[in-house]
Every structure is written in structure tokens, then in C-alpha cells.
Amino acid sequence: MKIFTSAQIHELDKYTIEHEPISSLNLMERAAKALTRAIEEEWSNRTPVVVFAGPGNNGGDALAVARMLSEDGYDVSVYLFNVQNKLSADCLANRKRLLDAKRVKFTEITTNLDPPKLNAETLVVDGLFGSGLNKPLAGGFAAMVKYINQSPAKVVSIDIPSGLMTEDNSYNIHANIIRATLTLTLQQKKLSMLMADNQQYLGRLRVLDIRLSQEFIQNTECRCRILEENDIRPLLKSRSDFAHKGSMGNALLIAGSYGMSGASVLATKACLRTGAGKVTAHTPKRNYEIMQISVPEAVLQMDAEETIFSEPVDTEMFDALGVGPGLGQNETTAIALIAQLRRATCPLVIDADALNILSSHRAWMQQLPKNIIMTPHPKEFDRLAGNANSSCTERLMKASELAERLQAYIILKGHYSALCHPDGKIDFCSTGNSGMATAGSGDVLTGIITGLLARGYKQEDACRLGMHLHGLAGDLAAKDLGKESLIASDIIQYLPKAFLRLEE
């Protein structure tokens, strides 16, 4: 699914109108029918409905929905905000249709509003502002939003909660954004809907197909998109009947320190489960027995030190290197790490403590080879970028800038993990769940991507497929085990089922 900007959304509407062809009013009617069906699936006609409509096309949608709900037996009250006596043409047309129907209680607001009482039984339809909003709400609209938010009523937002902007909300006034129970967005998700700090406004999110031009959608370039199963399935390589361990890739993982051997175990197991033919784990001597017992399929390469990573490893014989899980941040380890990164001769994944070491030695990042893969969680990235208290959108844009500057791939982990490409493109992962918010989950991702690289996947494809497999395995595990008790080992256990799902 492509994620269009507000300007592109406007162009998509315009193109559909011109090339279907269909009038803008009839397109609004089509959208309103889809919205009405979705509302009626959730609430019966015994639910009192209060519609708040703005002066633009989002308000026009809301007026059309009000008319359709009233025709289906709902008790509907409508409040149309027309303070400047300036309605959009389609909003004005739907105002006339609504008044002609004579089924609803209609109030047009031209000065101050004495707001209606909203109780727990009330359903509010929020049609104040849509995806064209480009500045924070203020004045009477802000007061109206606060009034709705303070009420116990359920709220359905049309396309996007009023006050929430389509892209960047870093400088928005968060008290002036509707907190919806359900958001019914039209055709495609918006970028702001993928940001964790905006989830409090969306409630449940549904995407409604209103049959906008598929030709425009397919042919229009965009910076951001959500990767879905149909995008991922073609990336999966077929396995030759004549494959042997030498042809399936040789991976090296540098992971673990004293007390953190589990990180090495998880990354190594995940790498093996991803189909790498041979996996070598480089780890401190003290971890020997744990690793030998926990992952008998792996080859062990012991560091000279008992408890830390202390010396770079020759990577000539390896097809991919993953470094960082449980590594520790000892100064000796830091020096060994930069030496290792400088001399790496194969595709490289950097995670966890390796990222934390780079955060403390930021100048070293300029010495990194091109096309490396970095997999920070938000706090790791903030340390890496020297940035504190970023909004999710700011963090994403900084990750994209860093990926371009370093010519690297950066996976910013989260509910919608974001893959930032060296060319500025951003891919969001559609799989994964909150049960995966558990220690070791990131180590598993490092192992998966390292395994895919070893098997010969390009960095771009290893990231896309790795993110999807990681999240899909977590989703399949959560379906069987529940989210509450999910642990990182479960993700590894369900990797085979994730592969089978993609092979169907």
C-alpha cells in the first residue's frame, strides 16, 4: 500500500473524477455509502447520532453520512460549522440534500455554539476536518474538539481525526486533536497513522475502499509505502533440490558477553532457522558450554577473552556478518568493534550494543562501509543520532536522512517497523504485534536478516523479507499463544510456519 502525501491524495481524487469519469459530488456520495455501511456494522439504529461537520469536503462527507443514517432509521442531529459563510461546493450541495430530506435535526453554526449534551450512549461522527488540514486547530474548532474529547461519547472520525495532520504533527497542539473510538480512513492509510505517538487519536483504524483510480495509484511514485504479503512473497527464493550447506550461505554472528549469552543464542538460532547453511557464533570463552548445549547446530569460534569481545575476526570465508546482540560496551570491545567494521568483507548487520558503541563514538560512523544494515529501536536511534525526545515523525525523518548520508539501510523498529533506504525511500512493515515487545526480539531480527544475507539476498530484499518474516512469526505465535506470554524464542519457533505461509 502506497502512502500518499496530502497533495497526492488531492491529485488522486482529481484524477479519479476526470478519468473515471465521475462528478466530485457523486464520488463523495460513494465515499459516504462506504462510511455509512461501516458505521452501521458497528452501531445499531437505536444509537443516537450527533454529526459535527466542517465547512470543507470532510464536512460534505459527514452531511451525506448523516442523511444516509437518517434514511436507515437513526436519530441524527447535525451541527454544520459555517462561521465564515464559506462552504465548499460539495458541502453546500450536501447541505441542500440533507435539508430537503427533512429527516434530521439540523443546526448551522455561524457564531457561537451552545454544544449539545453528549452521553455514553451517543455516537459522534467527526467530520470537522480531513486530510487537507495543514495547521493546528485553534479558536472555536479547538474548543469543540476539547468538548468532544471530554465527553463519554463514542467517536467515529471520517478519514482522519480532526486536528491530526496527514504527515508531520511534531508541532501540532495535541490537546486540539479528536480522540476517536474508530477512524474510517478512505482508500489508503496516511503517514501520521503509522506513528506510535498518534495512536491515541485513531482508536481502531479501518481502511475503506472507495474505488479511487487504481491507474493513478499504480503509476504514481511515492516515498513511503506499507509492505504487504503480496509485495513480500515474490522476494522469497526457491530452494534448489541440489542445495547443500555450502550453497546455502555461511553466516558469522559476533554476539554475547558474560551474562548476555542468551542474545547470542537467540540470534544464532534465528539465523539457522532462516535457512543459512552454516552459522558460526563468535563469543567469549565463558559462553562456550551454554552455546554448545543451546545451539548444537552452530559452529563456535571463541574469543581470546573470557567475558568480552576483544579482537576482530577474519570474515573472508563468510557470506554475511551480524554484530551487536549482547556484545557489551567495554572499551576494549569498542576498539575491537571499529576494527571489525573497517575490515568487514561481507554484507553487515549492526544491532544493539554495536549501535550503542557507535553512539558513544559518532565519528566512527563515517568509516562504515556502504550498504550496511542497522536495526535500532527508537531509544538506540536517538542515542545514535544524538537526539533526545524526538517525535516519531522527526525520528523517522532523521533515520531517513542518516540512511542517505551513510548510504546505509536503517530499520527503525516499532509496531510499523520502518526500513529507510539509501535513496530516501521508506518501507513500513505490516506484520508484528505488541507481544513482540520483549527482550531478545531484536536479537532474533538480527539473526534472521544475517541469515538471509548469507543466503545471497540483496540488502534491500533481506531487510524487507526479514522484517516481514519476523513480524509474521510473531503474529502466528500470538495467535496460538496469546500476546501476554510471548517471548523471543517463540518467534524463532514460529519461523518455519512463517516461511510456509509465504510459500502457499
List the model feature ranges, each with a label.
Residues A64-N149, E289-Q301, S310-V313:
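N-terminal small/polar loop signature for handling phosphorylated ligands or for N-terminal nucleophile
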Residues L87-D90, G140, A175-I178, T283, ...:
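Short acidic-hydrophobic sequence patches enriched in Asp/Glu that either
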Residues R103-V104, Q150-A153, R405-A408:
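A structural motif corresponding to the C-terminal end of an alpha-helix
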Residues E121-L123, L128-C222:
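Internal gly/pro-rich beta-alpha loop/helix module
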